[in-house]
Amino acid sequence: MRVGITGVSGLIGSALADDLRADGHQVVGISRHEVAGGLAWDIEAGKLDPAALEGIDAIVHLAGESIQGRWTAAKKQRILRSRVDSTNLLASTIASLDQPPRVVVSGSAMGYYGDRGDEVLTESAAAGTGFLADVTRAWEEAAAPIADHRVRLCTARTSIVLATEGGALPRMRTITRVGLGGALGSGRQFWSWITLDDEVAALRFLIDNEVEGPVNIATSNAVRQREFAKRLGAALGRPAIVPAPGVAIRTALGEMGRALLLDSTRLEPRVLLEAGFAFESPDLGAAFGLLLDT
């Protein structure tokens, strides 16, 4: 199977590429700079060679500006445009193909739902409000035309991905190891999560199985943030009792801190579960034990 991956150098993209190659599949990395076995695209100029995608079996679209860092007006534009413009380019290129891929898994995120308190959010839940909700809604809308061209389309609403190689966990581990872990704000906000291995397995499941539409990529065991901190502390043998007031987080990190740390998003992966997907690491404490070798 030939699989195209945008964002192939990122945490999820690189892990997915390695996993596919290990099983003998051909990976075509789609990036700004052409690499061996891949191809380059110019999103700003709207250039992607259609011939290079002819006959490809699947595309996993993960490209986008990192949401980490202070959200200045310029940063927010890059977050939005990198996702929407790249997806528009991919959709228009697929529309021109004689042999389009049979499936496209297009990136999205749990930010689609916004800050929802204790509400259990399945894929049928309405979009929320706020910057990330606006971005992910526009991102998914840009991908929608792909389904008009004999292509099965999934939108992967990914949660917090736990990995030792990158993402949020290394920073949280460092903070906890020096004794500064604890509740952020009230600590009552739900954090939805998945390990990197399960994330990769879920994306491959979407490629291989007849699933379409939005898909929550998270375990069904979302936990309150204070419980997340407690379990991380237990895995590291450190207390997690130092709170960070919400006002301090908002002052220090601005809108980004509120959205990523204080918003509550309690995902239920109903589509994955009903399709028969099995998580290897559904328990947070056990996942920390595996990831942190404790």
Regions found by a protein language model. Give the residues of each.
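Conserved Rossmann-fold NAD(P)-dependent oxidoreductase catalytic core, especially the SDR/UDP-sugar
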Residues: 88-130
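NAD(P)H-binding glycine-rich loop region in Rossmannoid oxidoreductase-like domains
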Residues: 35-36, 40-86
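C-terminal amphipathic/interface module of NAD(P)-dependent oxidoreductases
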Residues: 259-294
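Mid/C-terminal beta-alpha module of Rossmann-like enzyme folds, strongest
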Residues: 208-255, 289-294
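Conserved beta-loop-beta element that borders a ligand/cofactor-binding pocket
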Residues: 108, 141-164
